[in-house]
């Protein structure tokens, strides 16, 4: 269920195939004007005018993503200039979310605009991991980290789990969701 409400391009396998990490979508909508990106060469901006949207009750959006085409554009070091080609080129840290305006923590140039001018608001990453023969759910992971911190708090989802290669992912496309095999 949790994977169904995650951003397709945020699903990735980490920690030597023992963790499946993802970023849950808590809201989304359309932005009104194109955002600055590597193609339009507009100046970096820290605000985005958006259509009315509501956030899922009980959640707290941490990030906004626009035009993501792979997990490498969603995770990694914060990067506010996609022209450099490294880091989270399609993710920005959200400072505030008003009904018609998203404010970022810093001005940003995005990797690309979304084809339909869509944005998604995301929670901090979560991960399912196989640790000590348990399937565990870790919340509040660091989007800048290359791996899941399995030393933190977790919820046990199942006991006596033994598999040699627990997770595999077939990346999503514009017209097909990500496929995860357990």
Q: Which residues does each PLM region occupy?
A:
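N-terminal alpha-helical signal peptides/signal-anchor transmembrane segments
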Residues: 1-11
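Cell-surface, membrane-associated systems
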Residues: 15-21, 26-182
């Amino acid at each position: 269920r949790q994977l169904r409400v995650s951003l397709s391009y945020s699903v990735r396998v980490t920690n030597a195939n023992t963790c499946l990490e993802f970023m849950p979508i808590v809201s989304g909508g359309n932005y009104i004007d194109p955002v600055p990106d590597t193609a339009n060469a507009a100046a970096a901006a820290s605000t985005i005018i958006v259509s009315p949207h509501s956030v899922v009750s009980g959640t707290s959006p941490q990030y906004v993503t626009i035009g993501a085409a792979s997990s490498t554009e969603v995770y990694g070091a914060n990067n506010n200039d996609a022209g450099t080609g490294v880091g989270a080129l399609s993710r920005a840290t959200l400072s505030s979310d008003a009904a018609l305006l998203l404010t970022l923590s810093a001005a940003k140039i995005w990797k690309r605009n979304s084809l339909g001018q869509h944005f998604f608001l995301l929670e901090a990453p979560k991960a399912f991991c196989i640790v000590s023969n348990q399937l565990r759910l870790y919340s509040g992971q660091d989007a800048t980290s290359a791996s899941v911190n399995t030393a933190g708090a977790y919820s046990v989802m199942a006991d006596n789990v033994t598999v040699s290669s627990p997770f595999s992912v077939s990346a999503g496309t514009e017209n097909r969701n990500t496929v995860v095999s357990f």
